[in-house]
């Protein structure tokens, strides 16, 4: 008797996530301009090439005086603007007008704010000397060689500004993923078309495209006919992206119906099937496959199930591809309203709306009727986790959820 095929069993969410974290690997790194690096993951630490700031500089607009000169009246002998370099030895009774960011002309100095002096343009009279001396000292932000940005950091505007300030014009970042998305189903028509009887508009293609935007994926989308032979021929053409895609997403055809051929299509092109179904609701018909470093998902065609699988599983792979490590998907929050359980035998991911109240996530379950229900997704920004066969959840109960608008 042959042993049971482990792929044939239904995987739970944790098992699929653990598998994806194990098999997905960071993509290659490349050097790009700062403009192209926004949102990408840094693949090497960035160190300060010199002290930051590299010289003592004024933190205010004002006048430079000697620390050991306790006088109140001074003669203006020079002016230093930001970008000037004018070293000099100040004598007692002398001052230099200085702009914010200007390099101090020497050491053992103090900057008096312009608000604390009276001046006729040639001399000043100090009315108040505050401590400290309004100076940003050399190296007070970072010393030469100090790590400024760690590897595996996602680059946001503030980080990019720091890189620019230390001359890192071409940081080493993870390249963007190449994704091929195949939509299946003869009933699908373009959103701008009027469906005939038995047809529906394609909502999954824009769902996939918009979902991929945070990872800046290079996306190729095409439709496959509901004919396996024709589909295979189309994917074998020289211009097919199947050979170069890092990630293959197939919408629909992941179940076991007579016209569902996603699994056999993947096997035909040499993909090893790792998962053939899950114990989730919605999202039971899910396929996970691998060919070398390429990963593939056969996603359920129903939009809500599609949405759930993208946020639970495809997101994990994209984060691993980017180099930022394992994704911490689940967060905890509090239910605002009671959720009546239908005692379903499968773990359910329920569309919900969450808001932060005093740093605590509060979740409101949204109504949904089936895995094809799109109306709840218009306002959903979370998936509420409901355990299999669970009891009703009262308002105020602590629950797990996955944020979806990130």
Regions of interest found by a model, annotated:
Residues 2-11, 19, 64-221, 367-368, ...:
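Short, glycine/charged-enriched hinge/interface segments at domain edges or termini
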Residues 14-17, 30-35, 39, 44, ...:
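Flexible glycine/proline-rich
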Residues 30-34, 52-74, 107-121, 353-377:
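Short beta-strand/loop turn elements enriched in aromatics
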Residues 9-17, 30, 34, 56, ...:
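Generic structural signal for well-ordered, non-membrane alpha-helical segments
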Residues 7-74, 154-155, 349:
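Intrinsically disordered, low-complexity, positively charged segments
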Residues 1, 6-13, 171-299, 303-309:
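Helix-rich terminal scaffold detector
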Residues 56-58, 67-69, 87-91, 104-106, ...:
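Solvent-exposed alpha-helices and their adjacent loops that cap or buttress functional pockets
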């Amino acid at each position: 008797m042959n042993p049971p095929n482990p792929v044939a069993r239904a995987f739970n969410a944790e098992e699929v996530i653990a598998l994806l974290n194990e098999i997905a690997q960071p993509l290659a790194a490349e050097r790009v301009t700062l403009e192209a690096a926004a949102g990408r993951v840094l693949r090497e630490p960035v160190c300060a090439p010199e002290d930051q700031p590299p010289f003592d500089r004024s933190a205010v607009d004002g006048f430079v005086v000697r620390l050991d000169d306790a006088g109140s009246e001074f003669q203006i002998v020079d002016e230093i603007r930001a970008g000037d370099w004018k070293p000099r030895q100040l004598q007692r009774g002398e001052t230099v007008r200085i702009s914010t960011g200007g390099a101090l002309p020497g050491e053992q100095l103090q900057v008096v704010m312009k608000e604390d002096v009276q001046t006729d343009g040639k001399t000043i009279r100090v009315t108040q000397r505050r401590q400290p001396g309004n100076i940003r000292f050399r190296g007070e932000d970072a010393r030469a060689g100090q790590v400024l940005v760690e590897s595996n950091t996602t680059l946001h505007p503030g980080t990019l500004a720091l890189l620019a300030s230390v001359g890192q014009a071409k940081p080493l970042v993870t390249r963007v993923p190449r994704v091929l998305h195949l939509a299946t189903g003869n009933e699908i028509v373009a959103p701008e078309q009027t469906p005939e009887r038995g047809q529906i508009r394609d909502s999954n293609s824009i769902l996939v495209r918009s979902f991929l935007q945070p990872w800046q994926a290079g996306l190729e989308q095409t439709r496959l006919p509901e004919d396996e032979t024709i589909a295979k021929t189309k994917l074998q053409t020289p211009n097919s992206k199947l050979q170069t895609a890092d990630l293959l997403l197939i919408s629909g055809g992941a179940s076991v119906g007579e016209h569902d051929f996603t699994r056999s299509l993947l096997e035909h092109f040499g993909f090893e099937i790792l998962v053939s179904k899950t114990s989730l609701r919605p999202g039971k018909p899910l396929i996970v496959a691998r060919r070398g470093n390429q990963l593939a998902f056969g996603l359920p065609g129903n939009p809500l199930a599609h949405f759930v699988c993208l946020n639970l599983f495809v997101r994990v792979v994209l984060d691993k591809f980017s180099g930022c490590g394992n994704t911490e998907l689940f967060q905890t929050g509090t239910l605002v309203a009671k959720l009546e359980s239908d005692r379903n035998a499968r773990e359910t991911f329920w569309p919900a709306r969450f808001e932060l109240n005093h740093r605590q996530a509060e979740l409101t379950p949204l109504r949904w009727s089936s895995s094809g229900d799109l109306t709840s997704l218009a306002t959903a920004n979370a998936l509420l986790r409901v355990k299999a066969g669970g009891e009703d959840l009262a308002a105020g109960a602590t629950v797990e959820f996955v944020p979806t608008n990130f």
